[in-house]
Amino acid sequence: MSPEIALNRISPMLSPFISSVVRNGKVGLDATNCLRITDLKSGCTSLTPGPNCDRFKLHIPYAGETLKWDIIFNAQYPELPPDFIFGEDAEFLPDPSALHNLASWNPSNPECLLLVVKELVQQYHQFQCGRLRESSRLMFEYQTLLEEPQYGENMEIYAGKKNNWTGEFSARFLLKLPVDFSNIPTYLLKDVNEDPGEDVALLSVSFEDTEATQVYPKLYLSPRIEHALGGSSALHIPAFPGGGCLIDYVPQVCHLLTNKVQYVIQGYHKRREYIAAFLSHFGTGVVEYDAEGFTKLTLLLMWKDFCFLVHIDLPLFFPRDQPTLTFQSVYHFTNSGQLYSQAQKNYPYSPRWDGNEMAKRAKAYFKTFVPQFQEAAFANGKL
């Protein structure tokens, strides 16, 4: 159900509270997922004119789970705070003295419900952390992370229910990784989503037993960061080592991700240097180039009255990855009506060369390759 449809069914006096939750409500580490509501119902009599829904189920992303709490207002007394039912978490009994926004409920503040939900989630986090005491190993993992502010202050924990047969229970740690994305070129962060939310990397580590014999890590990137780093398949994190600890493993993943970000930033500056060198060496032979991301360059060149195009595609992780050179005849066509072309990646190249050296080497390679390309164009293409 879309937020707008849900809000149209809410009692008008309660609508500001719910609007703040579903439109602006981001609670916890997963900034890519908003709060949402379902199961709208009314406690009013059937004679009460609508819209009159005053109770609903609130879905809250937390540590890779979705908490489903029932929130119950009274449309007849909209100035009163709501009641809460915590679904399957019957053992969760929040401390009323710590719910300051509930104790001093201010119906004139549209965000008062959202503020109470945030306080409840904080208490729920403490409740889950307390459940780890049943396992000395999992408690050790938690306490060692807690000693490092960069991890301890950005962590959510969900401890699964205890297995009555084995006495075991699972636990999941969700951590917001302290990786700086601010220097990623802005062109890579565009056109992903109208409201992409915060740029964030979350590491989920699931312990399927209390002795950490089955541990499953997974990395989640916000949409813009995933796009900027080359897609979901571009980054593979290492398996959790047998006998390893989170306090050793998490910095490894941070280091891997930081290096990936640096590769992207370095690639952008190196591509710009590369294209600047080609502009200098080839001058009026440059037909067009990508002046934003510096990922493409097209040259129009001539060799013994034979005109041809060279399309240069620079990869995201340039200079580590070699550019592709595509030679294209301006005279010859394939059977499908396309200009005859050949792509080349087997040419002299070193990622250690600067842009000027790459341009000089490319010019030398063009002179050696063009004769055989011209011959192939005449042999395989049609005028």
UniProtKB/Swiss-Prot annotation:
Record has Cytoplasm as a keyword: yes
Record-linked Pfam families: BRE
Modified residues (N-acetylmethionine): M1
GO biological process: apoptotic process; cell division; cellular response to ionizing radiation; chromatin organization; DNA damage response; double-strand break repair; mitotic G2 DNA damage checkpoint signaling; mitotic G2/M transition checkpoint
Subcellular location: Cytoplasm; Nucleus
One function term, GO molecular function aspect: tumor necrosis factor receptor binding
Modified-residue entries (Phosphoserine), positions: S2
One Gene Ontology cellular component annotation held by this UniProt entry: nucleus
Keyword entries, A-Z: Acetylation, Apoptosis, Cell cycle, Cell division, Chromatin regulator, Cytoplasm, DNA damage, DNA repair, Mitosis, Nucleus, Phosphoprotein, Repeat, Ubl conjugation pathway
Tissues and organs where the protein is expressed, per its UniProt entry: Expressed in brain, heart, kidney, liver, lung, testis, germinal center B-cells and various mouse cell lines.
Residue span of region UEV-like 2: 275-364
Region described as UEV-like 1: 30-147
Function: Component of the BRCA1-A complex, a complex that specifically recognizes 'Lys-63'-linked ubiquitinated histones H2A and H2AX at DNA lesions sites, leading to target the BRCA1-BARD1 heterodimer to sites of DNA damage at double-strand breaks (DSBs). The BRCA1-A complex also possesses deubiquitinase activity that specifically removes 'Lys-63'-linked ubiquitin on histones H2A and H2AX.
Domain notes: Contains 2 ubiquitin-conjugating enzyme family-like (UEV-like) regions. These regions lack the critical Cys residues required for ubiquitination but retain the ability to bind ubiquitin.
Similarity remark: Belongs to the BABAM2 family.
Subunit organization: Component of the ARISC complex, at least composed of UIMC1/RAP80, ABRAXAS1, BRCC3/BRCC36, BABAM2 and BABAM1/NBA1. Component of the BRCA1-A complex, at least composed of BRCA1, BARD1, UIMC1/RAP80, ABRAXAS1, BRCC3/BRCC36, BABAM2 and BABAM1/NBA1. In the BRCA1-A complex, interacts directly with ABRAXAS1, BRCC3/BRCC36 and BABAM1/NBA1. Binds polyubiquitin. Component of the BRISC complex, at least composed of ABRAXAS2, BRCC3/BRCC36, BABAM2 and BABAM1/NBA1. Identified in a complex with SHMT2 and the other subunits of the BRISC complex.
PANTHER family according to UniProt: BRISC AND BRCA1-A COMPLEX MEMBER 2
Protein name (Swiss-Prot/TrEMBL): BRISC and BRCA1-A complex member 2
Gene name per UniProt: Babam2
